[in-house]
């Protein structure tokens, strides 16, 4: 009975630990959370702020320190007393944290603005495919739009630090990224209301209205706010990023 009690205790501690780590990871990026889980409340995530993850100077050091802290906490859990399923998860988590810790020593090897799959081109796609299941999803989405300028500014800071460290991307790649920034959110399409971030947004709102989740008045209000944010936040953010890459 004592052995069974110890096993249960170890499993409980491990599951509490992994649940906490999961919640921290999810609430650090609303985009990641939304594409990972449909119902955050089912995972104990009920009070969160919609955020895009911003890069800050020294972030790699902080990330390494967090990985080290999590590995220390993980090591305090008796691996040999875990269930087979939890033991397997333990091994995977430990390996992942160790890899992240090793990568933290190479802070400028990432390329978030890659010409082929950088966030300048991926973010609009993620936004266009952002599923609306509730009114909260819509308000989260609009809050994320309102942070695109800060998000791109943080990526530009990262690129500037990379350049100072001798890791600036080649000129041909910079030119491709700049061209993408100049063409992804054209002012003309926004003025005409034909940009895909306008049309897909309206389509999703119409579905919520058909389900009785949103009224016509609320839909109209959300459409106006989306247009405002695309025009005053998102489009200028792309222009600023394009200019900053060559400054």
Where are these regions (language model features)?
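N-terminal maturation segment of proteins
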Residues: 4-247
């Amino acid at each position: 009975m004592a052995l069974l009690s110890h096993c249960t205790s170890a499993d409980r501690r491990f599951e509490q630990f992994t649940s906490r780590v999961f919640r921290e990871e999810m609430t650090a990026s609303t985009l990641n959370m939304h594409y990972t889980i449909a119902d955050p409340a089912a995972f104990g995530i009920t009070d969160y702020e919609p955020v895009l993850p911003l890069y800050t100077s020294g972030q790699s050091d902080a990330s390494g320190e967090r990985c080290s802290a999590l590995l220390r906490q993980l090591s305090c859990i008796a691996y040999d007393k875990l269930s087979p399923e939890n033991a397997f998860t333990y091994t995977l988590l430990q390996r992942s944290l160790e890899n992240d810790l090793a990568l933290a020593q190479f802070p400028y090897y990432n390329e978030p603005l890659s010409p082929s799959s950088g966030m300048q081109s991926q973010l609009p796609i993620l936004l266009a495919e952002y599923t609306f299941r509730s009114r909260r999803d819509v308000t989260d989405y609009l809050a994320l739009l309102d942070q695109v300028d800060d998000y791109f500014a943080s990526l530009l800071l990262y690129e500037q630090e990379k350049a100072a460290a001798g890791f600036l991307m080649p000129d041909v790649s910079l030119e491709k990224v700049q061209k993408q920034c100049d063409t992804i959110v054209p002012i003309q399409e926004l003025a005409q209301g034909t940009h895909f971030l306008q049309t897909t947004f309206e389509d999703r709102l119409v579905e919520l209205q058909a389900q009785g989740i949103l009224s016509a008045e609320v839909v109209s209000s959300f459409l106006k706010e989306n247009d405002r944010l695309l025009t005053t936040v998102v489009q200028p953010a792309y222009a600023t990023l394009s200019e900053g890459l060559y400054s």
